[in-house]
Amino acid sequence: MIIPSNRTTREMKINNVVLVTNALKSLGSATKAELAGVTGLSIATCGAVLNDLSQRHEVLALELEVSRGGRPAQRYAYNPNYFSVLSLYAQGSDAAAQIVWSVNSATGESLAQGEIRFLPLTLATFYQQIGSLLADYPNIKALGIGLPGVVVKGTVATCDISVFAGVAVEQQLREKFGIYVQADNDMNYTAWGFYRSSCAGITAPVAYLFKPEVPCLGCGMVINGQVLQGASQFAGEVSNLPFERLDKLPVAEEMAKVIVSLTAIINPATIALSGPKISEALLPELKMLCLQRIPAQHMPQLTYRPSMRQDYLQGIAELTLSNYNLHIAFGE
């Protein structure tokens, strides 16, 4: 008698696939026994998962290991060419903007990067540039979009580039290009990229502050290894802190008030600072101003980032890759 698999059984199988693929990407290559040791699954279960993944070319069977007296063990690796990810963000304002992009393999390696002038400043231009990149790199199956504003469930609530305001950007791009799409705000992606490149493994909160040319301030936070988005994706909108004429203050005073607020609320271990109005020379003054309100033992480490570009692109690529892997596993 054949017993149909229930949802719990299906979810267990999916979890096994995710464990094996994540371990393969982390290790580079591995045998069934090595995967069993890392994942906690049995060798037989790892073998069954690898057989399924090999049949759809998601995993590659490599050379046999040199025998130490027994049967040679087969090594496996995740196929970097199984798909590619396009990470892309628009930065600037209605006065001037550009599109910055990168393409990564299924295992995260950078394949190409570039930037494009965002002219004319229309949705049609934005979608046309994405279409051109998809044509140039036909293996792209997932697209991550970053925008300078508030993005709620794939729809842009507000944006420094007003053409995006109110646009259901995820839905429109999925319908137009037929690929997986996710969109989020610039600071969430950038904070995650900084966390992964500089603070990976730290459970204490980490924050990223960006001071652009325009009178506002952006913030992204990672807590317990997760991006803090909030109940309605409004977390990090520090320009709304109740300080009178905050954006009229000298940059050091404005930043210090926000750093003190973050320290009192989430107590971060590290705060990264970036933007055209920030320099490394500003950090000593910032620390001095903060220490007027914060006891020294609670003062976070301040780290200057000359550019947010690599943090931003890494954040988009890693989060999109992770979510697309789950999308594949669940077959959605």
Segment roles from a protein language model:
Residues 93-95, 150-152, 215-217:
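Short, acidic Gly/Pro/Ser/Thr-rich loop/turn segments
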Residues 103, 150, 220-221:
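Hydrophobic beta-strand positions
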Residues 110-197, 202, 285-292:
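Glycine-rich phosphate-binding loop and adjoining helix at the ATP-binding site
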